[in-house]
Swiss-Prot record:
It comes from the Bacteria. Its main location: periplasm. The complex comprises the extracytoplasmic solute receptor protein DctP, and the two transmembrane proteins DctQ and DctM. It is found in: Periplasm. This is C4-dicarboxylate-binding periplasmic protein DctP. PANTHER family: C4-DICARBOXYLATE-BINDING PROTEIN DCTB (PTHR33376:SF7), PTHR33376. Residues 1-26 form the signal peptide.
Length: 333
């Protein structure tokens, strides 16, 4: 059922469509770029950079309006809004495409599938990444780029050193069957919850812990309500920058070319700062002193991997064995 907000936004989208069909109008083409995180995260800064460059490279023909912190839609609502044309651009986390029916993207959620950023970028910046983005076309979505956030850490109010430490803990996750399997493998109880609701849920004890890259944990002040965190780097959180396909295909060719250039440069910028931003956030949380951080030893990491890597085979039928194989082959190149 359509929400009132989406229906209201559709009125504006219809007006935009009419404006595009009348070349004589000098009004700029408006691109509403919605996302759910803070402006000072890697994604938030990437969106701001795209806003700047898009207007520059289209000579003012495009006006990008960035809406951070779920100002327009929560993360569960965003994709529907995009498909209906209520917003034109999003950068949802890659876990969001599984529930949409493009389960290949859940390969990014598999624990310990990427050793480091170098291995990751062989996928997101290579042929495997292009193949994955192309699968969105059938859903009325055009994929433009992959943006990094970073590798995730685990947090809770009790130490998380070994897999047994998760037994019975209620852990917040995004809506993802892979992340459910990950938490189940650890003996935790996965709790699907919108990102905007996590701080309060941690504060009130609705959930015991969660997983996030440091930048997300820090900018949402989750370290204020989590006593312990483990730098596990067990999983990756990234985004796909996407647009409504009908909107994109209807843009004048020169405008689309300018936007593609802006996106390419914004992607280099966003990915270039992601690792640095996470390192800064981690250090800032350590300095704040409200959370005790633990670095896994080699022995502890091996124990985590032993418990979590069987999730790869468990999810092969859902994600696609060929997709998993293609990603692993790309990382090994």
């Amino acid at each position: 059922m359509l929400t009132r907000r989406i229906l209201g936004a559709l009125v504006g989208a219809t007006a935009l469509s009419l404006a595009l069909s009348v070349p004589a109008l000098a009004e700029p083409i408006v691109i509403k770029f919605s996302h759910v995180v803070a402006p000072d995260t890697p994604k938030g800064k990437g969106a701001a950079k795209f806003e700047e460059l898009a207007e520059k490279y289209t000579n003012g023909a495009v006006d990008v309006e960035v809406y951070p912190n779920s100002q327009l839609y929560k993360d569960k609502e965003e994709l529907e809004a995009l498909q209906l044309g209520a917003v034109q651009m999003l950068a949802p986390s890659l876990a969001k495409f599984g529930p949409l029916g493009v389960q290949d993207f859940e390969v990014f959620d598999l624990p310990y599938i990427f050793k480091d950023y170098e291995a990751l970028h062989k996928v997101t910046q290579g042929e495997a990444g292009k193949m994955l983005l192309s699968k969105l076309e059938a859903k009325g979505i055009t994929g433009l780029a992959f943006w990094d956030n970073g590798f995730k850490i685990m947090s809770a109010n009790t130490p998380l050193t070994m897999p047994d430490d998760f037994l019975g803990l209620k852990m917040r996750i995004q809506s993802s069957k892979v992340l459910e399997a990950e938490m189940n493998a650890l003996g935790a109880v996965p709790q699907v919850m919108a990102f905007s609701e996590v701080y309060q849920a941690l504060q009130t004890g609705v959930v015991d812990g969660t997983e996030n890259p440091p930048s997300n944990m820090f900018t949402q002040k989750m370290n204020e309500v989590q006593k312990h965190a483990t730098v596990s780097n067990h999983g990756y959180l990234g985004y796909a920058v996407i647009v409504n396909k009908q909107f994109w295909d209807g843009l004048p060719a020169d405008v689309r070319t300018g936007l593609e250039k802006a996106m390419a440069e914004s992607t280099d910028y966003a990915n270039g700062i992601a690792k640095e931003e996470n390192e800064k956030a981690l250090q800032a949380m350590k300095d704040a002193g409200t959370t005790e951080f633990h670095e896994l030893t080699a022995e502890e990491r091996a124990a985590w991997e032993e418990v979590l890597t069987p999730v790869h085979d468990e999810m092969a039928e859902r994600i696609g064995a060929e997709t998993i194989a293609a990603v692993k082959a790309a990382t090994a190149e």
